[in-house]
Amino acid sequence: MSCTLTIAAAVAALPTQADTLVGARLQERVNAALGVMSFALTPDVTTGSLSLNNAPTENPDLAMTTLGGGATMSQEVPIYLEGTAGYSRYDPTFVATDGETEKRIPTKWNSLSLTGGIGWDFPVIPDLKFRPVFNFSLGRVASDAKIAGSIVQHKKGDEVDFLENGTLEVYGLGGSLVLDYERYRAENEIDVELRYSNIQLQSYGDTFAAVQGSSDAQSINLWSRWRAPTSFTLLDRPVRYVLEAVHTEYLGDMRGALGFDALNSLGIGLELDSSKYDIFITRTRLVFRYQFGDHVEGTSVGFAVSF
């Protein structure tokens, strides 16, 4: 079982324009917020942590981080369980006007999502498994806008109410298809995983009528990792070096939602083996990653443990 937390990253994104509150394309922004949430639904090191900030070009700020993991319970009963928790903050700027003057309205949209998955491993050939997974998600988007002044004080209705203190409750249903190759030998360990995910997000409950939202979250992810022992020992076990390469292609509403259609990640790190001792954690990894895609690039640090 593994649990991965990526703790830092920075990338730059394409510019977008601020919106006008009157006919504000608020619905598009809500769908965009759900699109941002889509990036935190499944374990993916390319979006484990993202920070988009391009204030000079009026690009909405975005910060996102996830914590997730998954494991097959046993070889005898190969049920697979996974879970991901994601947090994001999306800060679009709207413009209110009374026909004569304009006022910028900064907003902060915070979202939290929890996604679970349950699947089953079917052996294909030695070291290769096919894994269908059923996924389910719950999430919330909360808006906090500092709206004041005569320009917007006279404006009433769902749009302004939502910007001031609105919430959007979201659920998601879908699934994933995974091919998982694991070849573990004393001289090296190879992991390769190909995953297609499709989760449909939809708002529900007492949501403002003006901001009903939905998002089609689809992605194809190819993840690979090579681990091999070094000449150094710690805790009576060799310290391993780790090489990692990942490519994620975004589909559906995720494609282009943040200014790119795909992301790549190259990583290098070290792994500490504590399996000789009677402790809960058997391995600990620290991986430095370089992430890049169309018009975006950045770095991150990933921390992971195995049980």
Where are these regions (language model features)?
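Short glycine/proline- and aromatic-enriched beta-strand/turn motifs that initiate or cap beta-hairpins
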Residues: 14-102
